[in-house]
Amino acid sequence: MNILLAASEVAPFAKTGGLADVAGALPQELHRLGHDVRIIMPLYRSVRKQHLSLQHLGELPAVKMGDAIRTGRLWQGSLQDVPVYFLEQDDYFDRDGLYGTSQNDYPDNAERFGFFGRGLLAALPQIGFKPEILHLNDWQTGLVPALLRTEWAEDPFYAGTATMTTIHNLGYQGLFPAETVATLGLDPALYTMEGLEYYDQVSFLKSGLVYADMITTVSETYCAEIQTPQMGHGFDGILHARAARLFGVLNGIDDKLWNPQCDPALTAPYSVDDLEGKAANKRQLQKQLGLSCDADVPLLTMVTRLASQKGLDLVEQAWEQLLQRGVQLVILGSGDQDFMDRFAQLGAQHPTQTAVRLGFDDRLARLIYAGSDMFLMPSHYEPCGLGQLIALRYGSVPVVRKTGGLADTVFDPQDQATQANGFTFREISPSAMLAALDRALALYRQPEGWKQLVRRGMQGDFSWRQSALRYVELYRKAVELHHA
């Protein structure tokens, strides 16, 4: 199949979250399955700084944005054997952040990603690549299905092209003032309750949900959760109405990129058959972060975005009780400034028992996965989650709230003794989190039982292959629905 994946961030070029990992890994697996898959993303300042070897493909056709005409340029690079197109438009994308500063989103994000949607549709005929499916991701590409139904409706180039919108996180909805319709020069007929209108605002994500041929999200449990009022972020009605076209496909991880046997960031390699190197990584992590070097102390870690979704309120409320249990606690992450400030203060109070590192550091993240005994994800909601999959691969036992993709990948001995690979809790409370941790700590004190759990986690197959095969199945179904 001819597949174009459009995303606002793609690892390793630009990343703020899990979307980038998916957008970088899935196309490579689709390519290995024999499909002609290509990627398109904006050319951000951070991408320029990498001095990639890019080929200039020419000027973009003029893109009309309301009363203004915007121009841009098109570049081509590659990710392994997958072509990657970069849309250059310096007024929109030559900035320090992808979406904003640590305090605020950029005020012109509607224009920026409106341009990205229009620009990618203008670019493909110029490139001469006619996709059977446009795989769109999150609100940043949400306008594309609406544009295809209006501005491009009569264009023969896209006559047979189906669309799929993947929801990586329903909490990010691309909400903008109603006047955005005029600012971007969108067809006013789109601004209805059945279209882009959402409580007197415009929602880019809603456009993707309403107008795409198919919707997917990143785990089966999250797919069910978002059709409920409690978890639907106001879109449960739309999603329930489109349930016949809504599917959950679990994300994978790139098992070549995440492999403790050959990860260059680790002090010592190790494997499911030889766990000895894991202890050396724990020792190095303790030393590097200024923690007491003790092989026996349970080392509990988090690599996370510092946002309310991630259950950091539970960690903050349980901080002293966590430390009273004798664990060492390591947190690496960046995000909301108030969380960063509060956790920096907490981390400084017990420097030999806790370490909080703000920002993102890939080498340190890898050492954390390898050196930790337990990996904590107490998320209020978690569409899929990649952290628990990497933790399992690296033999770090996940302690997670049973929601979304966490419920689909982490199995508690109380529920599934033969498949157990971690510990789960359901209630959103510090006491429920601590109870799950206490069960983990009890098993940690039984070395043979603990090793068995660690090994079972490391043996799990969370590679992209099965997910990619499922996506191909759904791409074909989307094309059928488009032609029906």
From Swiss-Prot:
It comes from the Bacteria. InterPro entries: Glyco_trans_1 (IPR001296), GS/SS (IPR011835), Starch_synth_cat_dom (IPR013534). Pathway: Glycan biosynthesis; glycogen biosynthesis. Its EC number is 2.4.1.21. GO terms for cellular component: cytosol. It catalyses: [(1->4)-alpha-D-glucosyl](n) + ADP-alpha-D-glucose = [(1->4)-alpha-D-glucosyl](n+1) + ADP + H(+). Transmembrane segments: none annotated. Keywords: Glycogen biosynthesis, Glycosyltransferase, Transferase. GO terms for biological process: glycogen biosynthetic process. Gene3D superfamilies: Glycogen Phosphorylase B. GO terms for molecular function: alpha-1,4-glucan glucosyltransferase (ADP-glucose donor) activity; alpha-1,4-glucan glucosyltransferase (UDP-glucose donor) activity. ADP-alpha-D-glucose binds at K15. Synthesizes alpha-1,4-glucan chains using ADP-glucose. Belongs to the glycosyltransferase 1 family. Bacterial/plant glycogen synthase subfamily. This is Glycogen synthase. It comes from Syntrophotalea carbinolica (strain DSM 2380 / NBRC 103641 / GraBd1) (Pelobacter carbinolicus). The gene is glgA.
